[in-house]
Swiss-Prot record:
UniProt function note: The key enzymatic reactions in nitrogen fixation are catalyzed by the nitrogenase complex, which has 2 components: the iron protein and the molybdenum-iron protein.
Protein name, UniProt field: Nitrogenase iron protein
Recorded superkingdom: Bacteria
SUPFAM superfamilies the UniProt entry points to: P-loop containing nucleoside triphosphate hydrolases (SSF52540)
Natural source organism: Rhizobium leguminosarum bv. trifolii
The keyword Metal-binding appears for this protein: yes
Positions bearing ADP-ribosylarginine: R102
Cofactor note: Binds 1 [4Fe-4S] cluster per dimer.
Requisite cofactors: [4Fe-4S] cluster
Length: 297
């Protein structure tokens, strides 16, 4: 059996990280891979498309019900879904109460101690990436996830989050084996999105693994709590996810130590691509509008 690959999908909230990861993992099953998903997002939506159900019970919720994590059995928290994919959600506290990253730490320790990582080819962590705090960075910090894939788009905040995540990876890369596997761009149909994604990947000393085109069939599948791979296996979008899965599968050992950029460099890049207008351009447009308004009858 090949060595266990521990990968993680990071990305800002709402970027489509969980949807992308579940579709990719469903496609990896078709390549004969055995997979465990560890959801590390407080929304606990990392496995619903694989399980074809509402969010599963989380480790923290079930531990609270039973008394403590020590009172749990592996079967209490681990469910099996599409293609035999094993699913666990770490969960988190109520909003405004405690550290959401605590669930990540508790879950990973529990799963390792109870043999959940045995007999799988991939462990995939689905992690919130708006902030890379100690808890959410746990898969990186503890040298669990060794290949990080950042899901992003051509939108400003998605680019900012991707750069921030790269900074978090860099912090732990020198002391461990964690590497940036690459960027995955979820198309939002912004200006020059593909060019921008490739440019950011290059600046981060990485590569754009795949550009996932926008397609409404993804939403149709999600409404039915299914991946596109399951819902419409012969669709063009399913083929895109299979292509992405193949790229990740062949990317073992090809990760890099990222070179994050400053906020000023990120803004300069947006200016270079004509995405963000300079102060001079904004003033010119404002003056033109004022002149137009003054001469209007």
């Amino acid at each position: 059996m090949a060595a266990l690959r521990q990968i993680a999908f990071y990305g800002k909230g709402g970027i489509g990280k969980s949807t992308t990861s579940q579709n990719t993992l469903a496609a990896l099953v078709e390549l004969g891979q055995k997979i465990l998903i560890v959801g590390c997002d407080p929304k606990a939506d990392s496995t619903r498309l694989i399980l074809n159900s509402k969010a599963q019970g989380t480790v923290l919720d079930l531990a609270a019900t039973k008394g403590s994590v020590e009172d749990l059995e592996l079967g209490d928290v681990l469910k099996t879904g599409y293609g035999g994919i094993k699913c666990v959600e770490s969960g988190g506290p109520e909003p405004g109460v405690g550290c959401a990253g605590r669930g990540v730490i508790t879950s990973i320790n529990f799963l390792e101690e109870n043999g959940a990582y045995d007999d799988v080819d991939y462990v995939s962590y689905d992690v919130l990436g708006d902030v890379v705090c100690g808890g959410f960075a746990m898969p990186i910090r503890e040298n669990k996830a060794q290949e990080i894939y950042i899901v992003m788009s051509g939108e400003m905040m998605a680019l900012y989050a991707a750069n921030n995540i790269a900074r978090g990876i860099l912090k732990y890369a020198s002391a461990g084996s964690v590497r940036l596997g690459g960027l995955i761009c979820n198309e939002r149909q912004t200006d020059r999105e593909l060019d921008l994604a490739e440019a950011l990947a290059a600046k981060l000393n990485s590569k754009l693994i795949h550009f996932v085109p926008r397609d409404n069939i993804v939403q149709h599948a999600e409404l039915r709590k299914m991946t596109v791979i399951q819902y419409a296996p012969r669709s063009k979008q399913a083929a895109e996810y299979r292509w992405l899965a193949e790229k990740i599968h062949s990317n073992s050992g090809k990760g890099t130590i990222p070179t994050p950029i400053t906020m000023e460099e990120l803004e300069d890049m947006l200016l270079d691509f004509g995405i963000m207008k300079s102060d001079e351009q904004m003033l010119e447009e404002l003056l033109a509008k004022e002149v137009q308004a003054a001469v209007a009858p």
